[in-house]
């Protein structure tokens, strides 16, 4: 397993602790096998949700998986991860992926990953409480999802204020922090229902092409904000 890289984390940069050791893929064949295994899981309909581990590390991945709804959270155990440093585990930006699967599919998922030689760790489960609880050894850490979503989006808001007029940035941040993002478009037109809808990807692209559309995406921003803005405009 690749060791966790500390010096170039976004978290480390915020503390002015910047080094020259960067996360990298040391075994491209393993990376390829992992990608193909995940594609097999997707094609077989075994993945409910997924998110890459990249900028911001594991904790950012888990939070972003919760940002797009208004209910529920996660209970996470890091005890099966052999690294003791909680900061490295939560904030390291080594390439990885987090997936959610149904209990009835977990044995099939495990077999596919093991047959492909892909290492994995069961992290936790969804909960009704609106926070992420992270356990490591005797310590438990609580992360408030809605509060951290506002913090996460604040940088985009500050940039929007300089690039938009007439209070549009304030209206936008008010809408996205109060409302369930998935309610920005009709359930019948969700991506999951493309195959049953007249609104196919081709139609969407054709409609978008008729508009003067400008999508701004800051570094480390999640793409769901501009995507949801597009959906809202089309409905």
Residue ranges and their predicted role:
Residues 210-213, 220-222, 229:
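Mature N-terminal segment immediately following signal peptide/propeptide cleavage
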Residues 1-91, 105-210, 218:
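Intein/HINT protein-splicing elements and their conserved insertion hotspots or analogous self-processing inserts
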Residues 65-72, 223-235:
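Short helix-loop-beta junction
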Residues 98-102, 214:
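Short hydrophobic/aromatic beta-strand micro-patches
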């Amino acid at each position: 397993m690749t060791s966790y890289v500390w010096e170039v984390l976004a978290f480390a940069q915020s503390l002015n602790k910047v080094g020259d050791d960067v996360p990298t893929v040391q075994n491209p064949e393993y990376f390829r096998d992992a990608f193909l295994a995940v594609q097999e899981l997707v094609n077989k309909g075994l993945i409910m949700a997924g998110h890459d581990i990249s900028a911001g590390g594991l904790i950012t991945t888990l939070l972003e998986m919760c940002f797009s709804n208004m209910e529920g959270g996660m209970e996470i155990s890091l005890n099966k991860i052999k690294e003791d440093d909680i900061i490295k585990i939560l904030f390291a930006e080594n390439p990885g992926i987090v997936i959610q699967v149904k209990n009835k599919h977990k044995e099939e998922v495990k077999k596919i990953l093991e047959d492909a030689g892909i290492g994995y760790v069961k992290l936790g489960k969804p909960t009704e409480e609106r926070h992420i609880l992270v356990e490591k050894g005797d310590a438990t850490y609580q992360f408030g999802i809605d509060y951290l979503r506002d913090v996460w989006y604040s940088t985009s808001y500050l940039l929007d204020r300089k690039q938009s007029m007439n209070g549009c940035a304030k209206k936008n941040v008010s809408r996205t922090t109060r409302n369930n993002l998935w309610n920005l478009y009709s359930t019948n037109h969700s991506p999951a229902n493309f195959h049953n809808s007249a609104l196919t990807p081709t139609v969407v692209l054709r409609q978008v092409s008729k508009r003067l559309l400008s999508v701004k995406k800051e570094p480390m921003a999640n793409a769901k904000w501009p995507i949801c803005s597009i959906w809202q405009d089309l409905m």
